[in-house]
């Protein structure tokens, strides 16, 4: 267990944990990732928070992240609206755009595929207390038993999650599970559920 007294210590610990978790993710290998990701997708599409949602706000997976494409395809097959993020340059904000297929995506910030900034497809994020049934699918390097996550350091989901009125579901492989608490900072916001495969 770590005892931290200053913000700098927390920052160093977070960076070290990110490096370690990134290495763990890479060591799983393509076949192991594919098996785990299929199991995760199968659990997500049967999860009550997902089944109840009319709108699915999800990341587009890249690299060794848990693959979200099967979840997205399932959402489309059920008539759900799917929105994916576009990073707002120079900020830690995301705008969410409706997609109906994987065509027309462009290379965005951090090498991540993003939707085009089409005002006609810009989605309003349902805030706390709204009647919209929505779920957010959230990436991370690691998750703990309280739903706290270790993200990538940009703060995008730390800004997004408090403004989101639906349920949030973090995705991770079993190797990404943390026995140690991951709520390093006051602004860290846990997800409602974590699906591990």
Range-by-range predicted roles:
Residues 43, 149-150:
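Short linear sequence motifs
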């Amino acid at each position: 267990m770590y005892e931290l007294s200053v913000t700098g210590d927390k920052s160093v610990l977070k960076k070290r944990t990110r490096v370690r978790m990134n290495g763990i993710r890479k060591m799983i290998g393509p076949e192991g990732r594919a098996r785990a990701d299929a199991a995760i997708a199968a659990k997500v599409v049967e999860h009550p928070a997902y089944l109840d949602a009319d709108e699915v706000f999800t990341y587009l997976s890249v690299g060794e992240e848990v693959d979200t494409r099967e979840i997205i395809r399932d959402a489309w097959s059920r008539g759900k609206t799917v929105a994916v993020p576009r990073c707002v340059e120079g900020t830690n904000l995301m705008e969410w755009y409706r997609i109906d297929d994987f065509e027309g995506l462009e290379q965005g910030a951090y090498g991540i595929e993003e939707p085009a900034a089409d005002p006609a497809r810009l989605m309003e994020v349902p805030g706390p207390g709204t009647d919209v049934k929505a779920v957010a699918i959230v990436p991370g390097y690691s998750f703990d038993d309280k739903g706290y996550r270790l993200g990538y350091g940009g703060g995008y989901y730390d800004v997004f999650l408090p403004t989101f009125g639906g349920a949030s579901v973090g995705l991770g492989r079993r190797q990404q599970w943390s026995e140690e608490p991951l709520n390093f900072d006051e602004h860290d916001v846990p997800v409602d559920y974590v699906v591990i495969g």
